[in-house]
Amino acid sequence: MVSQDSCDKVTKKYAQLKLFSYFCVMKLAPVALFVYNRADNTRRTLEALARNTRARETELFVFSDGGKDEKSWKRVHEVRSTVKEFVEAFRKLELVERPENFYLERNITEGIAEVFRTHDRIIVLEDDILTSPYYLQYMNEAFELYNEEPRVMHVAGFTNLALPDVPFYFTPHMSGWGWGTWRDRWNGHFRHYTSREEALDGLTAADLDRIQYGGVFRCLQSLDKRPIPWDICWEIAIYRAGGLCLTPGQTMVRNIGLRQGTHFRSWSLLQRYEFDREPSQQPLPLTRIENPEKDEAVEARFAQAITDWGIRYTPLGKMLRFIYNGKHIK
């Protein structure tokens, strides 16, 4: 008679071999990179992406927005020349040159739609996002593991938390820096709203309170911008659908362009320390969780993190927290 221990070992070995085969043959998502007029940032973004372990197996679509005037067109051409230097770094590089200035929101939403005509999942980067060498591996594993779980609508590359004991977690809050989604989730739920009234139609005061984490996360202020940013539209879409965002416990991306970005305001620089951390240099272990739910403990930490301007990552912030709280908070 075969012992239970022997059966367990065979079962474990079979599961390991099945998982190995699963990820060796998995379908890799294309990357859509959106660029405008920052050649230096674009180069750094592409260099980091090219260092990814799955870069040479990955299709890259670069959507280059057009200029607004003669000066900006000159910088746009510099960006396009920079992109062409990386044609050998990926399985395929397709450069889409916009003939006019689409602006960020239109360039992104139309670019995503173009990729989804031929692919069922997408990884989205902008021209100021440095990725971990294991970023593409992480994103594609997440796509494979949760492809059949429609509640998981978004895969994030960034977290403003640092959770060394939590490889990944689920939250209704999306991060738009180095993210990805599936065609059925995006096409089924995303709407690019044109007014605050349209965006919030049917939502209650309690809904708005939950979206804004009790008022500390004032994301709905973005609804007063014109055009309305795509990311707040997606945030609301995920909330309306009861969706979740798979998010890493350690950030897999770093934003290097806030000082120059389209939506950046100089007065908010002091709030951006947390966004300028080095991405993880280690693979992120992912597993399939049945019936995923948001982690209430992590949600509480996120709500707290929003209020401290990210200075907990600076030496001064850590010292102040040690003095006032009697312990370090990562």
Question: Predicted regions span which residues?
Answer:
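Leucine-biased recognition of intrinsically disordered, low-complexity hydrophobic segments
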Residues: L17-L19
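An acidic/histidine-cluster motif and surrounding catalytic segment
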Residues: M26-V124, I129-K330
